[in-house]
C-alpha cells in the first residue's frame, strides 16, 4: 500500500476509520449552485476527492474558466471535508493533472502542503488506479466515467461505496535543518 498512498502534510496526524464515500471534486459552492456534499452524510466517513474542479480546461467553466477558483485548492477541499464531518480525506489526481505530468504519481510529501494542522483531518493522496478499483468493486462506474459525467453535467455524482471501509493512520514529523550561508 505504500506505493499507492502517501500522507499529505496539510492534514493532521492521527488514526481514522470509516466507510468510504466518493464526493467528486469535494466542492461546496452555493454561489454556483454546486455541492458535491449535497444529500451526502459523510460524518465519520473517509471521503475520496478529485483534485482541481469541473471543466478546468473550459474557458466558459463556471469555476473561473481555465483559472483555478478558490474551490480548486488543497486547503479549500480539506477544510470543506472537515466542515462536513469527514474522518479523513483521500485526494486523487484528476485526468488533466495526469495528462500534463505524463503519469499518475503520488506527490512528494512537501508538494501538497507544508503545515501540520491539528484542527483538521488526516489527509492522504492515492493513485487513480487504486481509487478506480475501489469504485468498481463497490459496483460503481470507473473514475474516468465519473469525472467525465461531472464535467459534462456540472453536477455532483457523489455516492457511498457500498461495503468499502478504510482505516489507517497518518504520522508526519516536521524537522528543521539549519543552513549555513
Report residues per predicted region.
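Long, well-ordered, tryptophan-enriched scaffold segments
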Residues: 83-100, 108-180
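Noncatalytic luminal/extracellular "stalk/propeptide" segments of secretory-pathway proteins
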Residues: 1-60, 158-160, 165, 171, ...
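Proteins synthesized as precursors that undergo proteolytic processing into mature forms
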Residues: 60-68
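Active-site glycine-rich loop that binds ribose-phosphate moieties when present
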Residues: 30, 69-75
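Well-ordered alpha-helical segments embedded in enzymatic catalytic cores
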Residues: 76-77, 180
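Composition- and surface-driven signal marking solvent-exposed, interaction-prone regions
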Residues: 62, 103-104
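Glycine-centered flexibility motif
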Residues: 24-26, 65, 75, 95, ...
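Mature extracellular/periplasmic domains of secretome proteins
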Residues: 11, 36-42, 78-87, 104-114
Amino acid at each position: 500500500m505504500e506505493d499507492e498512498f502517501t500522507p499529505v502534510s496539510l492534514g493532521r496526524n492521527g488514526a481514522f476509520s470509516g466507510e468510504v464515500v466518493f464526493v467528486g471534486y469535494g466542492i461546496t459552492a452555493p454561489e454556483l449552485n454546486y455541492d458535491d456534499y449535497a444529500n451526502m452524510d459523510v460524518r465519520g466517513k473517509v471521503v475520496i476527492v478529485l483534485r482541481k474542479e469541473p471543466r478546468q480546461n473550459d474557458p466558459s467553466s463556471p469555476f473561473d474558466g481555465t483559472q483555478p477558483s478558490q474551490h480548486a485548492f488543497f486547503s479549500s477541499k480539506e477544510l470543506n471535508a472537515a466542515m462536513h464531518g469527514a474522518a479523513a480525506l483521500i485526494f486523487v489526481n484528476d485526468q488533466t493533472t495526469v495528462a500534463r505530468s505524463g503519469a499518475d504519481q503520488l506527490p512528494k510529501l512537501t508538494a501538497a502542503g507544508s503545515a501540520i494542522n491539528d484542527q483538521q483531518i488526516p489527509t492522504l493522496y492515492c493513485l487513480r488506479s487504486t481509487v478506480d478499483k475501489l469504485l468498481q468493486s463497490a459496483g460503481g462506474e470507473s473514475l474516468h466515467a465519473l469525472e467525465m459525467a461531472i464535467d459534462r453535467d456540472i453536477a455532483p455524482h457523489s455516492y457511498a461505496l457500498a461495503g468499502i471501509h478504510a482505516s489507517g493512520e497518518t504520522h508526519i514529523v516536521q524537522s528543521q535543518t539549519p543552513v549555513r550561508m
